[in-house]
Amino acid sequence: MSKLNKSIVAEFESAQITRELPKFSQGDTVVVNVKVKEGARERVQAYEGVVIATKNGGLNSSFTVRKISHGYGVERVFQTHSAIIDSVEVKRRGKVRAGKLYYLRGLEGKAARIKEDLAAAAAAKAARLAEKA
């Protein structure tokens, strides 16, 4: 791809990216509020789980959230800049060392828990308080 084409694609992508989501990474517990259309009406549905993977690719970036529902593991892949995402809230910062947490698929119960990163949580709280003041 030539430099001209790359610059045109980059300009188009920057125009399409309309909002900023909060910073989160693998191991964080997030609540994704998803717009669900049922017939003529639209409502917002919360999907809470652990981020097990992120793919950063500009406009094509995505993240995978895993939760346990009625004893079964459920994973959902969200496009980061999708219109169906109403908002994302970080509930808990996880302390993990791996880039992708696919190993959680084979674990259940207490073994599937992730330690909380208290330092990151305190820093995020301080940043929120400074932003409000």
Swiss-Prot record:
The keyword Transferase does not apply. InterPro entries: Ribosomal_bL19, Ribosomal_bL19_CS, Ribosomal_bL19_sf, Translation_prot_SH3-like_sf. Pfam families: Ribosomal_L19. PROSITE patterns: RIBOSOMAL_L19 (PS01015). GO terms for biological process: translation. GO terms for cellular component: cytosolic large ribosomal subunit. It comes from the Bacteria. Keywords: Ribonucleoprotein, Ribosomal protein. GO terms for molecular function: structural constituent of ribosome. Belongs to the bacterial ribosomal protein bL19 family. This protein is located at the 30S-50S ribosomal subunit interface and may play a role in the structure and function of the aminoacyl-tRNA binding site. This is Large ribosomal subunit protein bL19. It comes from Stenotrophomonas maltophilia (strain R551-3).
